[in-house]
Amino acid sequence: TLKQKGLTWVNIDKMDEESFNYLKTNFKFHHLDYEDLRGGKQTPKIDIYKNYLFLILHIPQWKNSTHSINNAELGFFIGEGYLITIQHGHSKLMKNFFYRCMKNPTVKKNWMDKGSGYLMYKIIDALFHDTQPIIENIGKQIFKLEENIFKGEQDSETVKQLAIYRRNILRFRRIIDPQRYLISNLSHIRKNFLDENLSIYFDDINDYLSKIWSITDTYKDTIDGLHVTVDSLMNHKTNKTINALTVISVALMPLTLFSGIYGMNVTGLPHAEDPIWVWLMFLGLAAIIVLILIILKKRKWL
């Protein structure tokens, strides 16, 4: 718990029985809010009451172990003179900001002197801006993959990487999308602890979310375009291989025909007993094969 100039910030790292009882003892929130706290994962939302608001936000978070994006769920109770932040799961996002405020008197003063609404703005703003490295990392990965593709790296591993990057972009956008409307609603709510002066701050967060939404939309289009390019290049390689195999089979047809005829166990075949004729026949077949290859080359089938 942090206190500054009539404002109390309570941060709950884990919603266990002790934390639950603390909230019920010290704050008179609606019973539906308490049910939400115990109900596991919740969708992003704002519940507006006479004396307080209850918010649930989702923040994109990078998970190194799986190289994927997950969402961290955060809850807020905000009223006149207090802010309660609740963290679900194993994320340390809120905890880091809480300790930063606790250990740095300047940050504590700047964040908490202007009331609970401004403190909530600073927390939400910091949380969303903390996702910037995720966006930059995805952009670098896509740029590097694009260069490799046009250097000739088009294989199953490339297709797999494209699928992973596309999954991460879609997950990021799926998490961010509801938050844009939620933050937009916050800028229009009028309470004693959320006055009109705070609207510009929440609009600024919304502008940032719109910016990263636009960036990820570009990334998604780039990935889709690269996927089509890789498919086309791989199909082209496959077609060239099939063409080469077809040419080989066509070129060997005369040899197959003659070997089939003279390989039969029959008598009376022309020049079957003449060794010189056999060699002449091989030379003739070789000439036919070369002629077929030249014709195919001129017609650009090779």
Label each region the model flagged.
Residues 1-197, 201-204, 208-218, 301-302:
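Peripheral, non-transmembrane regulatory/ligand-interaction domains of membrane transport proteins
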Residues 207-302:
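Hydrophobic alpha-helical transmembrane segments and their immediately adjacent juxtamembrane loops
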